[in-house]
Regions:
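Formylglycine-dependent sulfatase
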Residues: 1-306, 314-342, 346-349, 361-370
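A glycine-rich phosphate-binding loop feature that marks nucleotide/adenosyl-phosphate handling sites
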Residues: 353-358
Length: 370
């Protein structure tokens, strides 16, 4: 079951506009709301229209609504927005990215798409304001994952799985307040249900409500947040698991003897909708540029365990898994990850096989809590 199944009994109309990457429809029975492109790799993205959002929001004054607007930017092929706002030569690239001319050009295009998306968010909020329902509506803004640069999307580094979460609810949530509370995606549904007046105790959710954090009644939420990556069908199997307490991140690469290959990111032709022509420049420069070699090797050849003090090493470039001074921290996080995997029925590497992937596509999961 999904969001529509749980909010509909509380009287909510539940709609979705934009990108849809979930199926079958009977498991995710959102009302389709028109106006935003559903294809995240179209070049260019189709112009968006706001009439569908306005109609959905205002249609029934007696029934509340929940609307997901899944914007497709920023996403390869990074063609929307005005990249001239970000001169490539003036950019400061993060240390986990190789510094090549093509990378700078693509990073500028990526930033332009973020700016384009930010403008869309403003337009959506104006539609809400014009409906007269803004003061009674909780708005959550978050992202799916990190950027499509090596070491980000399709990884369990912080730059791959840690995204921002912004909330607005006039009169209920204090504007400008920040919190270090640790939450994860699984917590969003029970949070919405709790705020909508539902009883979250009657269902065994993977997450738990952080409504008290939003309302300023609590400063902390969960002890740990977890992540995983199974690489099939994006490339050869390369299962990864991670846990963070908000300050430290522990990563476990379950097949460290393998090299990591991601078929889209490493696309060489540069003409496909998911290919990244900058990757070829990383490979080209790795033989004579020590930093480029370092980030290419970091991406493709990973140790069994990684431990990062993320609070002081934002891009997680210093692996401290072998540091005896922080052995207790590694043991604590590793134990927490073990307990979570057991609770999820996660066997580890066997999950990332063609057989397990095909079974999941057919709804016949080989693993998990039965």
């Amino acid at each position: 079951t999904s969001m529509p199944h749980h909010l509909a009994p509380l009287g909510y109309r539940v709609g979705l506009a934009g990108k849809v990457h979930v199926k079958p429809r009977k498991a995710f029975p959102f009302e389709e709301v028109k106006g935003f492109d559903t294809n995240c790799v179209r070049n260019p993205t189709r112009p968006h229209r706001l009439e569908g959002l306005g109609e959905f929001i205002k249609r029934d004054q007696k029934k509340p609504f929940c609307l997901v607007v899944a914007l497709v930017e920023p996403h390869i092929p990074w063609v929307m927005g005005d990249a001239s706002q970000y001169p490539p030569g003036k950019l400061k690239l993060p240390p986990n990215i190789a510094d090549t001319v093509r990378t700078r050009q693509d990073f500028a295009a990526y930033l332009a798409e973020i700016t384009y998306m930010d403008g869309q968010v403003g337009e959506i909020l104006r539609v809400l304001e014009e409906s007269g329902k803004a003061k009674d509506t909780l708005v959550l803004f978050t992202s799916e994952q990190g950027s499509q640069f090596p070491g980000c999307k399709w990884t369990n580094w912080d730059t791959g799985v840690h995204t921002g979460l912004i909330a607005r609810w006039p009169g209920r949530i204090t504007a400008g307040r920040r919190t270090d509370a640790v939450v994860q995606y699984a917590d969003i549904l029970p949070t919405l249900l709790a705020l909508a007046g539902g009883d979250v105790s009657g269902h065994s959710y993977d997450g738990r409500s952080f409504a008290e954090v939003l309302l300023g009644q609590e400063d902390k939420h969960r002890k740990y947040a977890y992540g995983l990556h199974n690489n099939i069908p994006e490339g050869p199997r390369y299962p990864v698991r991670t846990v963070t307490d908000g300050e430290w991140r522990y990563i476990r690469n379950l097949l460290p003897e393998e090299i990591y290959i991601e078929k889209h990111l490493m696309g060489m032709k540069g003409t496909g909708v998911l290919n990244n022509p900058y990757w070829a420049t990383w490979v080209r420069d790795s033989w004579n540029n020590p930093h480029t070699y370092k980030v290419v090797r970091r991406y493709m050849r990973r140790p069994a365990e990684q431990l990062y003090h993320t609070a002081h090493d934002r891009y997680e470039m210093n692996n401290r898994a072998g540091d005896p001074d922080v052995a207790a921290i590694k043991a604590r996080l590793s134990g927490g990850l073990d307990r979570w995997m057991k609770a999820q029925g996660d066997p580890g590497a066997p999950q990332d096989t063609h057989r397990a992937h095909q079974a999941a596509r057919e709804g016949k999961h080989l693993y998990g809590v039965k």
